[in-house]
Amino acid sequence: MNFYRSSIISQIIKYNRRLAKSIICEDDSQIITLTAFVNQCLWCHKRVSVSAILLTTDNKILVCNRRDSFLYSEIIRTRNMSRKKRLFLNYSNYLNKQERSILSSFFSLDPATIDNDRIDAIYPGGILKRGENVPECLSREIKEEVNIDNSFVFIDTRFFIHGIIEDTIINKFFEVIFFVGRISLTSDQIIDTFKSNHEIKDLIFLDPNSGNGLQYEIAKYALDTAKLKCYGHRGCYYESLKKLTEDD
């Protein structure tokens, strides 16, 4: 596990049975530790994101391409001008072309010439707003990011996966809770209704049986875990997200 003081992992371990062995997956900018638990008692801290790994009816995994790279968001967010410049000059290859152009003009600096166009991918989800529960948060985020109504989404709440994400570029840690789910739509139907927005530029669909990269590794761990027996769970097997929202 990452050397990070988690805000909720001690409570998760205390009240939820571990379902599968932890794994670590990483690339050139992130190290992610994943641990699956039987859903016996889960609540989410305000700084913990909730995300859904969703399969379409044509057996594709839905993934969102962020409009802004993680690095660009951090450079814009930080108030320390020296840190802004350092991140830009040292890691400009983790920006997309438009971001590099914008920041070059802003700082009047030219980093080393880079041709790549960075794309950061995520699963739909986000942080709970005040007064929201997990189903409400997922419903809102999936609608905002992907334009899918919660009546088309079904979530397996028998288990969840706790993730610690270390961003080695900006030197920060993040926590996320993943759920597995299904969408009663094909990938083509989802693309037809999707509208590019301020958070998500476009969508991609992964083959759950073959692939590479962090999003594929996360999905494979989640889908393999879904096949295990979740004895003692207090959730549901692919319950309608709309019904979960109404029940809570």
Swiss-Prot record:
Catalytic residue list: E141 (nucleophile)
Residues that coordinate or bind Mn(2+): E145
Keyword Cell cycle (UniProt): no
Enzyme's top EC category: hydrolase
Domain Nudix hydrolase per the UniProt entry, residue ranges: 45-227
Highest rank taxon of the organism: Viruses
Residue interval(s) of motif Nudix box: 125-147
GO cellular component, one term: host cell mitochondrion
Name of the protein in question: mRNA-decapping protein OPG122
Organism: Variola virus (isolate Human/India/Ind3/1967)
Gene: OPG122
